[in-house]
Amino acid sequence: MQLLAYMKPNKVITTAIQLSLPVGIYLGIISNSGWGWWVACIFFYTVIYTLIGNNIAYHRYFTHKQFEVSKPIQWLFLWTGAMGGIGDPISYATTHLVHHKYSDTPLDPHGPTRGLRSVLFCFYKRVSPKDTPLVGRRVIELTKKYGWLHNYYLIFLLVSIGIMWAIDYRIFLFCWLIPASLFTWGLGVAVLAQHWGFRARNTWADRWFPHYEGLHLNHHDAPMAPNTAFRKGEIDYTYQFSRIFNPKFDWRGQPDVTNIK
């Protein structure tokens, strides 16, 4: 049982990936790789691990299930989300749903209530059923389907990384180590910015960073809404990009925008 506990997602794994960024950049520089590898690095950071893996897959599909997709796309979502280094869908969804229920309180797992140091994942509050009781059908569904990944997450991650390394050291470096580390830092900063002032807010970043979910207040007002652009001039890049996966959206959670000012 103790060995199994080490294989499960934990804050140590994610923090280690975060802190590896200087090493990754140094190794990238001394590798004398062409600019194409650095372009690939930025692509994996912004599109693969952030926009697809976190925003679309882990956040909107696995956690809130705002839509349904085909089986091959589900596996793609599982891989892109897991390779970001932030755990499996079960741990992610549980933490996020607790965040929604106890937002900006001492029981919130992350954000300004945990202090600026929570930009590092090791300072997130550990989700405990005793402190933050949460019974959700979605978590039960995810546990039945992806319990194996929750139990053997570290093995899954190491095997995937090993395959990358075996194909080409630069694939490991520019398609995982550097971009995954950038992603974890970006996510750590995002959860602080989204609740700066101890309240959910829409941030200026939603217009200038397409890979960033900046309409966070809108999301908290309607967590099941597939499109969080409620007002004139707003655009939900994650929703727009997710349409390439031919999803079947559940529009029951979408508010009547005519009543929103």
Predicted features, each with a name:
Residues 1-187, 225-261:
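Non-catalytic, topology-defining segments of multipass membrane proteins
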Residues 189-236:
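Glycine/small-residue-rich hydrophobic helix-like segments
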